[in-house]
């Protein structure tokens, strides 16, 4: 494709090779963001917000790379549980999807996610039966200071209603100058949680053996 694009004088944007897709988020996100800006779908202000988030993210890295840090603490709290990750449709549902995928690929842990207010329309009733299993679940609430007041109220009330059902409940949020910075920091923070969860599970977070085996079998079958 690159050769064909060069032949026709088209721009080519490449991501460095050798990285797992989940580890290349910084490259893929930045490239897509710039392309959308050039097409007029993203304002320059958003790009500036991303650029201004670099320094706070670097600070967060230094904090989470210590022997004792909040990401490790959360990984310890959800160890040997099945995490149920709840976010808001305002913003944090994005990081909930990412977090579920990171726990699966890095820590080899099964988890589930949903978002508010939709969770209140159906899933909350599912916490009624199988109490012996529910006690092995942990609930992780991904929150943002700009979540809709109604969503904040729903999360708070739901947390109280589910207090006796889940084994434990945890809140995760980030501070920042704007929603973009807070979202990027939240995603980065939960990435670290998945990394520490892998270490606690005594597994290497890099290989994805089941995915590779799946691809191999599909290539043979198709």
Predicted region positions:
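A SIS-like phosphosugar-recognition module
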Residues: 1-8, 13-222
């Amino acid at each position: 494709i690159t050769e064909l694009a060069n032949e026709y004088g088209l721009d080519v944007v490449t991501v460095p090779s050798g990285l797992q897709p989940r580890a290349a988020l910084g490259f893929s996100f930045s490239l897509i963001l710039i392309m959308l800006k050039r097409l007029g779908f993203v304002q320059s202000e958003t790009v500036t917000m991303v650029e201004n988030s670099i320094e706070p993210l670097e600070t967060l890295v230094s904090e989470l790379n210590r022997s004792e840090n909040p990401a490790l603490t959360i990984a310890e709290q959800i160890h040997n549980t099945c995490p149920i990750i709840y976010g808001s449709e305002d913003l944090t549902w994005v990081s909930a999807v990412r977090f579920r995928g990171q726990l699966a690929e890095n820590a080899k842990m099964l988890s589930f996610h949903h978002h508010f207010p939709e969770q209140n329309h159906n899933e909350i009733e599912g916490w009624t039966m199988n109490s012996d299993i529910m006690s092995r679940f942990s609930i992780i609430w991904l929150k943002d200071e700009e979540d809709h007041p109604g969503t904040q109220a729903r999360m708070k009330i739901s947390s109280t209603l589910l207090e006796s059902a889940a084994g434990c409940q945890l809140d995760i949020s980030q501070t920042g100058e704007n929603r973009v910075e807070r979202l990027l920091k939240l995603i980065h923070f939960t990435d670290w949680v998945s990394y520490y969860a892998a270490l606690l599970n005594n597994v290497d977070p890099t290989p994805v053996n089941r995915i590779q085996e799946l691809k191999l079998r599909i290539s043979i079958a198709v």
